[in-house]
Amino acid sequence: MMMPTLMVMAKLMVESGIPGSIVNIASVAAKRPLVGAADYCVSKAGVAMLTQVLAAEMSQLNVRVNAIGPGFIETPMTQNIRADNEGNMMAMSMTPMGRYGLPVEIANTALFLLSDESSYFSGQTLFPAGGMYTG
């Protein structure tokens, strides 16, 4: 479903002649293997690569394409991890900042990527992940 939606939006942006920005949602799992989650990791790596390919194809058309790869965020998706002492310890051991991200932090990253403040960004995946890739 992602590809048809992206292609329709890209076509509308190009036809309008107005520069545009597309933001995809990947995950830290695009870069970091998670045991027992091969399907999720592979699909998110695919989103990151699709972002790069579309950015290369669409840059000349004034459409920027980027992605966000969140770490552990306080959402229903991480509720079971947060509720389980062992799961929570595992998540925090991977997150140097020692806390879960907030949904608003992901929203603010999207706002940045959609704004003119990021006009020279294209083909990038930003990782708001509490320092997960610092070491």
Question: What do the predicted segments below correspond to?
Answer:
Residues 27:
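Residue(s) in the substrate-gating loop at a strand-loop-helix junction
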Residues 59-64, 121-123, 129:
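Short, small/polar-rich loop/turn modules that mediate ligand/substrate recognition or access, typified
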Residues 32-38, 60-61, 98, 116:
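Active-site loop immediately N-terminal to the catalytic Tyr-X3-Lys motif
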Residues 6, 43, 51:
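Active-site helix of classical SDR
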Residues 11, 56-60, 119:
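Alpha-helical segment proximal to the catalytic Tyr-Lys
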Residues 31, 48, 69-80:
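Short, flexible catalytic-loop segment of classical short-chain dehydrogenase/reductase
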Residues 95-106:
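A conserved structural motif in NAD(P)-dependent oxidoreductases
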Residues 1, 33, 38-46, 107:
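The catalytic Tyr-X3-Lys active-site helix of short-chain dehydrogenase/reductase
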